[in-house]
């Protein structure tokens, strides 16, 4: 019996830019499912067809693009939180078998691990978990230094909403 090949989807950073109280119910539900409950929160998701459909539905409330490993490592270092609102530290990562933030970020972007965060994890002897246990699945960011162009126009039209490709990394660095 042959082992099935796993599909490796690209990793996307999704940042919520609009926090309108009168958001339509279906959009609010999709933002909630993506765990984007407040303005300037970010999630990192795989580009599977179901997730991409959700992102397309909330395209007028978020900006998104491909995240690079060094940007993800920086986000984990500066904005990563574990349950109890404690900062994610290098000691905590080493406790679970990871040597650095960069190692986790590279493994996630390359598709070696499927998820960044998971709840309770029972480690087996000498085995590293396939995630960071108890990591919060979203990152709270600051408003961007230098401000935004427009949260009413799409990126291609000179605004900030929608798909922006690898340029999302510049925006995230301005928000750290």
Curated annotation (Swiss-Prot):
InterPro entries: Ribo_uL30_ferredoxin-like_sf, Ribosomal_uL30, Ribosomal_uL30_arc, Ribosomal_uL30_euk_arc, Ribosomal_uL30_ferredoxin-like. Transmembrane segments: none annotated. It comes from the Archaea. The keyword Ribonucleoprotein applies. GO terms for biological process: maturation of LSU-rRNA from tricistronic rRNA transcript (SSU-rRNA, 5.8S rRNA, LSU-rRNA); translation. CDD domains: Ribosomal_L7_archeal_euk. HAMAP family: Ribosomal_uL30_A. One of its GO terms (molecular function) is structural constituent of ribosome. SUPFAM superfamilies: Ribosomal protein L30p/L7e (SSF55129). Belongs to the universal ribosomal protein uL30 family. It comes from Pyrobaculum arsenaticum (strain DSM 13514 / JCM 11321 / PZ6). This is Large ribosomal subunit protein uL30. Part of the 50S ribosomal subunit. GO terms for cellular component: cytosolic large ribosomal subunit. Keywords: Ribonucleoprotein, Ribosomal protein. The keyword Cell division does not apply.
């Amino acid at each position: 019996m042959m082992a099935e090949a796993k599909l490796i989807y690209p990793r996307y950073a999704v940042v919520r830019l609009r926090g309108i109280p009168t958001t339509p119910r279906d959009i609010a539900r999709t933002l909630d499912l993506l765990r984007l409950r407040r303005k300037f929160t970010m999630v990192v998701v795989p580009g599977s067809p179901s997730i991409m459909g959700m992102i397309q539905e909330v395209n007028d409330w978020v900006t998104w693009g491909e995240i690079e490993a060094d940007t993800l490592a920086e986000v984990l270092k500066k904005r990563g939180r574990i349950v109890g609102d404690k900062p994610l530290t290098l000691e905590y990562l080493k406790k679970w078998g990871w040597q650095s933030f960069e190692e986790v970020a590279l493994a996630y972007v390359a598709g070696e691990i499927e998820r960044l965060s998971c709840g309770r994890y029972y480690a087996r002897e000498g085995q590293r978990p396939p995630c960071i246990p108890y990591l919060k699945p979203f990152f709270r960011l600051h408003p961007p230094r230098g401000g935004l162009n427009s949260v009413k126009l799409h990126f291609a039209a000179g605004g900030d909403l929608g798909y922006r490709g690898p340029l999302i990394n510049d925006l995230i660095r301005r928000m750290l």
